[in-house]
Design a protein with these regions (language model features):
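P-loop NTP-binding/switch modules centered on Walker-like glycine-rich loops
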Residues: 173, 177, 181-259
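Conserved ABC transporter NBD signature motif
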Residues: 56-67
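ABC ATPase NBD coupling module
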Residues: 68-85, 111, 233-238, 275-281
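Charged, flexible cofactor/metal-binding loops and thiol motifs
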Residues: 230-322
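A short, proline-enriched helix->beta-strand linker immediately N-terminal to the Walker B motif
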Residues: 162-166
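Conserved ABC ATPase signature
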Residues: 142-147, 151
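Conserved ABC ATPase "signature" region
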Residues: 67, 119-138, 247-248
Length: 322
């Protein structure tokens, strides 16, 4: 479906992203997870060709047998709407406040399908129904400000899946929503992926959310994929010290609604912060924050495997998590 090979993104000769390999198989849901500044959104936008003009992208982004980096802007725009859908973080900033909802969704349909006339309106209603919006016939005549944040995000998802894409990229789609609405949107994305056999690249800073949504995960730090593979294997047996630290800093969920077990509990924290662009240390980019770092970590670790579907880059693997 999608294969990244030696993907490198730079701005003013400063390296931001350097991903040796990342694969998304057909029908899978892969979570791209890391702290703010780790390169998650930049990677997602590099795949979709949405980076600003001043960035330079090299390597390969293979999708359906073609390298997206070789396409013209026009070719990429056509493929992006028809084969790849993109859902942004903040729907209020992505929707046109001066345009009715039906018009905005219908634009995606007209651009990327052969439907015309009443068939377009029927498709808009069908899509709004699929994303579980009530009274779609009435809602399509409303403006974005008349909708809640959760409803706005459902509209964005409807527009993104209008042409029945093979891959949907969701960039922290629940960031601006309250917890209850977040869960509804997450369940919707899972349902749409399963119903349409649509691959999902789900960008998040929260491993717990990724575990809920995805069956594959890639952990990114400093623009590098440091661990990737089956979600259960990585959650239960993290190897890279950064992955283990993320899990230790995640409160998780109480068992049997026993919230009293969480009272007074101290969460572990990760010392320091993600280095600024151009300030990455040599070798393992996490080594300046890692309690287990040694001189060996000044050189780039080789790719190691914990299982056939679990790869990592770490000189001192965690060998499990408890």
């Amino acid at each position: 479906m999608l294969q990244l090979q030696n993907l490198r993104v730079t701005i003013d000769d400063q390296e931001i992203i350097n991903i040796a390999q990342l694969d998304i198989r057909p029908g899978t849901r892969l979570g791209l997870v890391g702290e703010s500044g780790s390169g998650k959104t930049m990677t997602a936008k590099a795949i979709a060709g949405l980076l600003p003009d001043e960035t330079k992208v090299s390597g390969s982004v293979m999708f359906a047998g073609q390298n997206l980096l070789d396409l013209s802007d026009r070719e990429l725009a056509k493929l992006r709407g028809r084969r790849i859908g993109f859902v942004f973080q903040d729907p209020a900033r992505s929707l046109n406040p001066m345009m009715r909802i039906g018009k905005q969704v219908s634009e995606a349909i007209r651009l990327h399908t052969d439907l015309k006339g009443k068939a377009v309106t029927d498709k808009v209603i069908e899509l709004l129904h699929q994303v579980q919006l009530p009274e779609p016939e009435t809602l399509l005549r409303r403006y974005p400000h008349q909708l809640s944040g959760g409803q706005q995000q459902r509209v964005m998802i409807a527009a993104a899946i209008a042409a029945d894409p093979d891959l949907l990229i969701a960039d922290e789609p629940t960031t601006a929503l309250d917890v209850t609405v977040q869960e509804e949107i997450l369940r919707l994305l899972i349902s749409l992926s399963e119903q349409r056999n649509m691959s999902l690249l789900f960008v998040s800073h929260d491993l717990g959310v990724v575990q809920f949504v995805c069956n594959q995960v890639a952990v990114i730090y400093g623009g590098n994929i440091v661990e990737a593979g089956d979600i259960d294997s990585i959650i239960n047996r993290p190897q890279h010290r950064y992955t283990a630290a993320l899990l230790a800093a995640n409160p998780g969920m109480p068992k049997d609604d026993n919230f009293s077990a969480f009272i007074g509990r101290r969460l572990q924290t990760i010392t320091g912060s993600v280095p600024a662009v151009g300030k990455f240390p040599s070798g393992c980019r996490f080594r300046n924050r890692c309690q287990h770092a040694s001189d060996k970590c000044q050189s780039i670790p080789p790719v190691s495997t914990a299982s056939p579907d679990h790869r990592y880059l770490c000189w001192h693997p965690a060998q499990g998590f408890s």
